[in-house]
Structures are given as C-alpha cells and as structure tokens.
Regions:
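Peptidyl-prolyl cis-trans isomerase
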Residues: 1-12, 21-361
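Structural motif
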Residues: 16-17
Length: 361
C-alpha cells in the first residue's frame, strides 16, 4: 500500500462552491490581488527579524507571557483540552512546535527594542519556506479566516450573477494593475511567481467586479440611515480618561480630588504620577458587564473605581457623541453589517465551509 504524503498547509481546502474547492493558497493569492497581503508581509518580516536578533543575542523571553498568550489563544478558540488544541492545529497543518514558535515570534515582535533593519523582500519573490511560515502565522493570527470570508463573498456574488460583464472586468483589471504598480508587459512574470496564469487572474478580477457592483447596489444612503436608526445607542461614542492606581484607597483619593476639589482627572494623575491615558470607544465594544453603567451617562461623569486584578482604574467620561453617517468609523460599521447580512444569505446558497468558520457567523 503506497504511503500517502501529508497534505501541505497551502493545499488544504477551506471552502467549496459547487465542485470547486478553494485552498489556503487560493485565499492568500486572491488577497494579494486585493492588496491585503503587503502590509501583513511587512509586519511578518519585522517580527521575524526581531525574533532572529533576539535569538542571536541569546535574550531570554518571559515564559509566563508566552504561556498567557497560548492560554488566551485556546480560550478564544474554545479549545479546552490539550487534545482539542492538537486536533485544531492538525486540521490546519500546524505542528505544536510551530504553535509555540509563533508566540515566541510575537513576543519578540512586541518586546525587542534593538536596532532593526528588516528585509525588503516582497511576498511574491519569497522562498517557499518563507511563504509557508507566513501562512502558519496567517492561520494562527486569524488573518487567513478573515481573508477566506472576504473571498467567499466574492465567490458567492459571482455564483449568483446571471451574466458576464466585460466592461466591469476591464475596469477592474486596470484598477488592479494601477494599484499593484505592475506594467501590462510585466504581468506574465508576476503571475509566474505565484504559479498562476492569466485565466486565473481574470476569474479573480471578474469575481471582484461582481462583488463591488453588488456592494454599490446595497450600500445606499437610505440603507445606511435605516441601519443606523436601531443602532443609535450601541454606536454612541465615548471618550474616556483613565487613571490606573495600585489600591482602593488611592482610587478613592482620585475620585475625591475630582468630585470635591474640582480637579481635572489628568491633573490628579500628573501630580500623583499615576498612569493616565485617553481612549475612544463605542458602546457596543464595551464589555457587556460594563455597558449598563454607560447607558445614561453624560460628559463629565466619573465612575466609581473598577477593580483590575490587584489594581484599580478610575474612569471619567470626557465626551459623549451620538453616531452620525459623517463619522467614517460609524459608517464603516454600518456598511459591514449590511454587507455581512447580504452575503451571509448568499453563502448559505453557494458556499460550503470545510475548515474555518467565518468570523461573522
């Protein structure tokens, strides 16, 4: 009986439509055409260089930080036992050693502070080994899931389209060449680096054109206004001022200085040398257990101290802003909801997930 070769990461089928399966390589290559790979590749090179230099200098990582990162990963993916984690990794072609190495790279990507000059190579010209390691990072970071979801929308849109539109394809091809800065005469060489041909590119661009046309039809101002109406409260924006202290008594002093003495919370933090920062958050992004206290607050509201492990935080609402379609973040949230709802209906008709569950489900 012949020995079966292990399935490599890039050829594992993530979803299918009809009789065609879409592999991890399909997902990454199509994301490359959409312009999504370049920033991820640059970050991958930066993190890998941090890791290389840290190991070269024999720096020691914080084992507790690595353990915490692995535990957080398992919690996020609902992997309770070691066996479930191993099965999850095996299904995706990732070894336990690669799992551990990923968290070590991420640790040094955050912690390494030495001089850095990462390589300037592109994804297209990278070695097979580099691309394979990059794919492992995409899997473990969740980026591949999101790319797969975006590709599935385009595949479903094309499957639902009754006819081809050559003009749209020509426009999409021109847009792609301009965005990728590829001369038409160089296109064949670029495709060869990916082991792809013109037919594949035309199929990818045709699906993109159909998807963009469908999106333009559903994202009208009227649709956005309708979507916003029931989301007014959830999309309310709060600017928060936060002071971090090490005891309940210290937190009580901060509250007293603000409420009784009329001091700005930033002044209290500066005088007492407490960590202070400002942030903006939408109500729907606040943990559920904290949302209730925000429902009726006004600008200037000071919350009672909030426990954070062995420390405490004091929050003050600096501003409260009602959502508006002129706010690009609010607009993007609403657009995402409309697009997800539309294409999830198409996915149920045209796409069968084999490996990943799309994030929006």
């Amino acid at each position: 009986m012949p020995v079966r070769q292990p399935i490599t990461r890039e050829v594992r089928v993530i979803f299918s439509s009809g009789e065609r399966g879409f592999t991890a390589k399909d997902v990454v290559d199509c994301a490359l055409v959409r312009g999504e790979i370049d920033p991820l590749w640059k970050e991958f090179l930066r993190v890998a260089e941090c890791d290389r230099l840290a190991n070269e200098r024999e720096l020691e990582s914080d084992d507790s930080a690595l353990d915490s990162a692995a535990i957080a990963f398992r919690y996020k993916h609902d992997l309770i036992t070691a066996e479930e984690t191993e099965r999850w990794l095996e299904d995706r072609g990732v070894s336990l050693a690669e799992f551990s190495d990923y968290f070590a790279r991420q640790y040094w990507g955050r912690s390494y502070s030495g001089t850095l000059d990462p390589p300037k190579s592109s994804y297209e010209t990278a070695s097979p080994e580099e691309k394979d390691l990059f794919l492992a990072d995409l899997i473990l970071s969740g980026s591949l899931d999101r790319m797969a979801e975006r590709l599935s929308y385009r595949v479903a849109a094309q499957a639902d389209e009754a006819s081809d539109n050559k003009a749209s394809l020509d426009n999409e091809r021109a847009r792609f060449l301009a965005a990728a800065k590829i001369a038409h005469a160089e296109l064949g060489d670029w495709l060869a680096l990916l082991c792809r041909d013109q037919e594949w590119l035309d199929e990818t661009l045709a699906a993109e054109a159909v998807y963009q046309q469908r999106v333009s039809q559903i994202l009208t101002e009227q649709a956005l206004q309708k979507e916003l109406a029931p989301m007014q409260l959830h999309l309310t924006r709060f600017q928060l001022e936060t002071v971090e202290v090490d005891s309940r008594n210290a937190a009580a002093e901060v509250v007293a200085c603000v409420r009784n003495d009329g001091m700005e919370i930033s002044e209290v933090a500066e005088e007492s040398r407490y960590p202070f920062h400002r942030s903006e958050v939408l109500l729907e992004d606040i943990p559920l257990e904290q949302q209730q206290r925000f429902l009726s607050v006004k600008a200037g509201t000071l919350f009672d101290p909030i426990p954070r492990g062995d420390a405490f935080e004091v929050w003050r609402v600096k501003t409260r802003t009602e959502p508006s379609l002129q706010d690009p973040i609010i607009r993007a949230r609403l657009e995402r909801r409309i697009v997800d709802r539309c294409f999830n209906e198409l996915l149920s008709k045209y796409v069968d997930w084999k490996l990943f569950v799309p994030p929006s489900e």
